[in-house]
Amino acid sequence: MSAELIAVYKDEQIIDLESAKVLGLSDGIKALNGTEPIYFDDSPLALEVIRHSCAHLLAQSLKALYPDAKFFVGPVVEEGFYYDFKTSSKISEEDLPKIEAKMKEFAKLKLAITKETLTREQALERFKGDELKHAVMSKIGGDAFGVYQQGEFEDLCKGPHLPNTRFLNHFKLTKLAGAYLGGDENNEMLIRIYGIAFATKEGLKDYLFQIEEAKKRDHRKLGVELGLFSFDDEIGAGLPLWLPKGARLRKRIEDLLSQALLLRGYEPVKGPEILKSDVWKISGHYDNYKENMYFTTIDEQEYGIKPMNCVGHIKVYQSALHSYRDLPLRFYEYGVVHRHEKSGVLHGLLRVREFTQDDAHIFCSFEQIQSEVSAILDFTHKIMQAFDFSYEMELSTRPAKSIGDDKVWEKATNALKEALKEHRIDYKIDEGGGAFYGPKIDIKITDALKRKWQCGTIQVDMNLPERFKLAFTNEYNHAEQPVMIHRAILGSFERFIAILSEHFGGNFPFFVAPTQIALIPINEEHHVFALKLKEALKKRDIFVEVLDKNDSLNKKVRLAEKQKIPMILVLGNEEVETEILSIRDREKQDQYKMPLKEFLNMVESKMQEVSF
């Protein structure tokens, strides 16, 4: 079965076999007329077809178990697939095994999956009395609607689908949740069931292993266990409290970044947390982003709490006159921003209402875009390398609705392409995915569990300089408008630390670990030596703790191991008398001895190994 053709690919579109036969693109065995074959395997294109059909298998099984069920949409998403539906029956996660069993029954029946095309009038009649299907059709233009059938079940769908349910053997329903109809909280709440599907048993097994591993690495769980951060209902949802260990971790990253930014010619700046609404009207945020902002009134004047740092940096630029000799100007700020997120989407540190961006804005001429972006790409590589992240880039180009001259857009986009080419970076292109005011590069990192995360962005902006009438004097003594480059490499410290925690499973590398060394005196007479060693390490900028509670030695060692501290030193008579230290090194997975002076030199050099 692994070599069977299940679909073809042409012009960036997956076409299922039934449709491909009609179009002369396949004879059912091989791809024809320049199309790319899609075989039954765990490749991305094949999985899209497999998971789409598994969503229909889920709906078919739900209809069999709950006859009054009505279905909205069942798309393929990054984490598998889901189906939104409603029924008068109460369904909980405890029902998922029963639903899954019914899915396996239908799969074993080897039902042919066929397609029929109806006019709008025919489709409305076919699904008469089904308000959810009518809601789907109301969002679709044209007069052709696909309906896929398998056994007695049929559903409105554009495809693509497998030719038969016999292909669906390796799937798992993963969770149940609520979802508003069409994502609008003013509409009724539907039930959403998520699932995953693969072509092979190995694919499913590996995925389920990753899910279990992800649960162990969940940053919300690690945040509590390692004492990094917390949330408090009395303070409010989405507003994290950084505990001492988490703040130490964060400060280390901030300090490393600041050192690198200063060396790279960035100037630190700081804008206010609240700004008059007048400037948000000039920037366009008031008209286009108001629902995500918080407002207050002071002396009968409306102010907006900043959701972004760009306006403050523009005002820094406007605080002085500039000539072409001043450019590029690079301003950076660890800017605290607030955005109104719905409570349902808040998720640990990954999605919060207050967060701090590693934000920078570069004001430069058009001719400097490529060199500035190239420098940002170099900086990005060094940061990702330090944290052992692989990453990819995606270039988003001009959308249909945009401002600016075609030649200006082309010039800006080519500058980004040339910068990527200069660094030999393979990148994807998201045609039309740019902002209305300029092209951008998105930085997507891959963690240890092979999950992709959107973090940083490099955004060329030709809009805000125009709105705020920014200018510099060029070499011909004429006023010229600068280009503004928004850039954040980590995205936000909150989000990045959440990803970092899960990437390392809490086993942070030595250079950023919130506690780098644990000192464990065996008894009271060794305590003075431990404190002396602690001071020597602190002078070398090492985060160190003395575990001196009245517990057994084994218990103190276990505590240090649970806290995932990179180095543990047990201090007894021998260590105090000889000053030869016994070291448990997590990174080396080894225990060894080292003279005190040599150890101090070693940890000092370890702190110098990493720079951005």
Curated annotation (Swiss-Prot):
Cofactor(s) needed by this chain: Zn(2+)
Record's function text: Catalyzes the attachment of threonine to tRNA(Thr) in a two-step reaction: L-threonine is first activated by ATP to form Thr-AMP and then transferred to the acceptor end of tRNA(Thr). Also edits incorrectly charged L-seryl-tRNA(Thr).
Entry's EC annotation: 6.1.1.3
Catalytic activity: tRNA(Thr) + L-threonine + ATP = L-threonyl-tRNA(Thr) + AMP + diphosphate + H(+)
Cofactor note: Binds 1 zinc ion per subunit.
Region span, Catalytic: 218-509
GO-annotated molecular function: ATP binding; metal ion binding; threonine-tRNA ligase activity; tRNA binding
Family note: Belongs to the class-II aminoacyl-tRNA synthetase family.
Keywords recorded for this protein, A-Z: Aminoacyl-tRNA synthetase, ATP-binding, Cytoplasm, Ligase, Metal-binding, Nucleotide-binding, Protein biosynthesis, RNA-binding, tRNA-binding, Zinc
Database matches in InterPro entries: aa-tRNA-synt_IIb, aa-tRNA-synth_II, aa-tRNA-synth_II/BPL/LPL, Anticodon-bd, Anticodon-bd_dom_sf, Thr-tRNA-ligase_IIa, Thr/Ala-tRNA-synth_IIc_edit, ThrRS_anticodon
Protein name: Threonine--tRNA ligase
GO biological process assignments: threonyl-tRNA aminoacylation
Compartmental location: Cytoplasm
Superkingdom as given in the UniProt entry: Bacteria
Principal place of residence: cytoplasm
Subunit structure: Homodimer.
Binding-site positions, Zn(2+): C310, H361, H486
Entries under PANTHER family matching the protein: THREONINE--TRNA LIGASE, CHLOROPLASTIC_MITOCHONDRIAL 2, THREONINE-TRNA LIGASE
GO cellular component, one term: cytosol
